Amino acid sequence: MIVIEIIDIKNFMAHLLLKDTFDHFLLFEARTVTASELLLKGRRRREWYDSDQWSRMCSERGEHDCMHMTWNEMKEIMFHFIKGKKSPQLLYVDLEASSRQREQILGGAFAVQDSELPSLRMQIRYENEHLTIVPAASYPSFLPDRSAGQMWEEALQEFLRRKKIVFHLLNNS
């Protein structure tokens, strides 16, 4: 497991909250603490939608992805909550790669059902003027091959480089 420390926090926050860099990721959970606390859960509530809306959304996005809000759908709420002169005491955003992203990253490396592939998540944490990202692969069942985690770590670092987000790896031993 690696820990990525972001060097230019202001640039990263612009990518996270203002640009479309992370818009296609699924939101698992987001939390921030300022004068009060805001918690956003990314699980989409099926009962909010009529059956036609739900069916259409799931056919467009796929069953897994339609169960979660995208970061694009939720980031404006977070932005309006934290904007101002003071930085939040805490900002935590847990994002998951969409099924399409996961397929691109893992390719045909695993001979298992799609439902048995690991979820690829990044846990973004800003606290005490430090911003870190911890990439994680969460497996729904036991697989002897755990290389998806390493593939995700490498893909995430390359993604950050392409977006010109400056970082270094922390020694997490």
Model-predicted regions and their roles:
Residues 131-173:
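Mixed-charge, glycine-accented linear interaction segment located at domain edges/termini
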Residues 61-130:
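Surface-exposed, low-hydrophobicity interaction/linker segments
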Residues 27, 32, 100-102, 131, ...:
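Generic "edge-of-domain/loop-turn" microfeature
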Residues 1-71:
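Charge-rich, low-complexity N-terminal segments
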Residues 52, 62, 68, 80, ...:
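General "foldedness" signal
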Residues 10, 19, 41, 75, ...:
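Context-gated lysine
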